[in-house]
Amino acid sequence: MSTNPKPQRKTKRNTNRRPQDVKFPGGGQIVGGVYLLTRRGPRLGVRATRKTSERSQPRGRRQPIPKARRPEGRAWAQPGYPWPLYGNEGLGWAGWLLSPRGSRPSWGPTDPRRRSRNLGKVIDTLTCGFADLMGYIPLVGAPLGGASRALAHGVRVLEDGVNYATGNLPGCSFSIFLSALMSCLTTPASAYEVRNVSGIYHVTNDCSNSSIAYEAAGMIMHTPGCVPCVRENNSSRCWVALTPTLAARNASVPTTTIRRHVDLLVGAATLCSAMYVGDLCGSVFLVSQLFTFSPRRYETVQDCNCSIYPGHVSGHRMAWDMMMNWSPTAALVVSQLLRIPQAVVDMVAGAHWGVLAGLAYYSMVGNWAKVLIVMLLFAGVDGANTHTVGGTEGFATQRLTSLFALGPSQKIQLINTNGSWHINRTALNCNDSFKTGFLAALFYVHKFNASGCPEHMASCRPIDKFDQGWGPVTYAEPSISEQRPYCWHYAPRPCGTIPASEVCGPVYCFTPSPVVVGTT
């Protein structure tokens, strides 16, 4: 039996009509005058032939053949994409030039350099080159070469794991510029600073020269866990620790200069991120740190044995000293996290537009890791108030609870004794009213007597009566008639020094961790 289709007779009805498709028993067919062979293999997007048990069921809707989605937007500066402006090719050539001659041969399809991009080209080229050089050593080249190749593959696996983890966590996309910002926050510090005296090492809180990171006018940025001891005019003196990494000559020195540096740094980071070249800017920044030279302004010595937290003797001071020496980095993170609320107010009031722009941009793109890094970076140099780092947290808590202090209050009652009336208590005066919190005074104004307060406050001077500016903190003479304890400008008497033999109780020796040396 012939399989050729039956020829049709040409009539007026079917002369101009489109030729019909013809199917053959073998699976072939003629479509538009072209013979098509049977398609072998499964067809994408179309359900296969149903089983006999399924033919009684209604046929479901066929799925369309999937089509490859065209990439939308930019394809560069994304995780896994090469850098623009020939950055990927340039780093590839840099790795080729840095690699030894033995690393030029390829390792085949499992070569780690096939999957590397950007800075990964340099890392993988060096590890593979080292493995090839180990393989050329006589006698032991085979085992050393195999171990070195396994090490190179392990490094590549770590790079792939880091790229996958940091590229798929929401809000935590990692970049080299993020590591550059983190390098400004803290430098890994040892738990103790030591000084060498005639071959004998003593544990001290004084910063060594290697712990000094940056020096400005009246300020020193250093690693956490120490306090600078500066020699000036043939005398050594401990500087005041404003933050765990920032010390000043005195507590009144403004930190505007350091905060402007942070403004410029965060503004540059935001601009680089907006231009999608953050990794390139971060690489330039990290490399520039290797060649940065800052002249020394001050002579730092280690003969002061400063306390990390200056102030009166308290349990909070001893606990803070112990924490700073136990883990300087942990103390730094805790201190900066607690300073974030005050830092937010300072960055708005101080018009730090670079930091505000960075926070706004990173928040809009959902990069919360960089938002936290910028907040910690600004909190690390935010020393606008005169409270030292150890007392800031305690003072903030005391200031919050003082708003709800009820103050001394009493109920006035009349008592009839033997026909005469007596008042059991005297009324509250203005001196006791000073101890009432602000919010409590608003809600309980009817419970205390404010008589005499205007007369008391008349002796206090407004702020325009004082000299403006900043400088060393001096003690006001409390014997002046204008000084009153309830005035805002009242200064207490300076602390004196008494011999330990006159102290009744334990005597503390403030080494890096306070130690009780005896009891008098």
UniProtKB/Swiss-Prot annotation:
Mutagenesis / variant outcome for changing S53D: No effect on HBV suppression
Region Interaction with APOA2, residue ranges: 122-173
Residues annotated as glycosylated: N196, N209, N234, N250, N305, N418, N424, N431, N449
Keyword Hydrolase: no
Record motif Nuclear localization signal, residues: 5-13, 38-43, 58-64, 66-71
HVR1 as annotated region, ranges: 385-411
Site (Cleavage): residue numbering on this chain: F177, L178, A191, Y192, G383, A384
Keyword Membrane: yes
Location of region: Important for endoplasmic reticulum and mitochondrial localization: 112-152
InterPro entries assigned to the protein according to its UniProt record, in alphabetical order: HCV_Core_C, HCV_core_chain_A, HCV_core_N, HCV_Env, HCV_NS1
Ranges facing Cytoplasmic side: 2-168
Disulfide bridge positions per record: C453-C460, C487-C495, C504-C509
Family, similarity comment: Belongs to the hepacivirus polyprotein family.
Additional notes on this entry: Viral particle assembly takes place at the surface of ER-derived membranes in close proximity to lipid droplets. NS2 associates with E1/E2 glycoproteins, NS3 and NS5A, which interacts with the viral RNA and core protein to promote genome encapsidation. The nucleocapsid buds at the ER membrane where E1/E2 glycoproteins are anchored and afterward associate with nascent lipid droplet to acquire APOE and APOC. Secretion of viral particles is probably regulated by viroporin p7.
UniProt protein name: Genome polyprotein
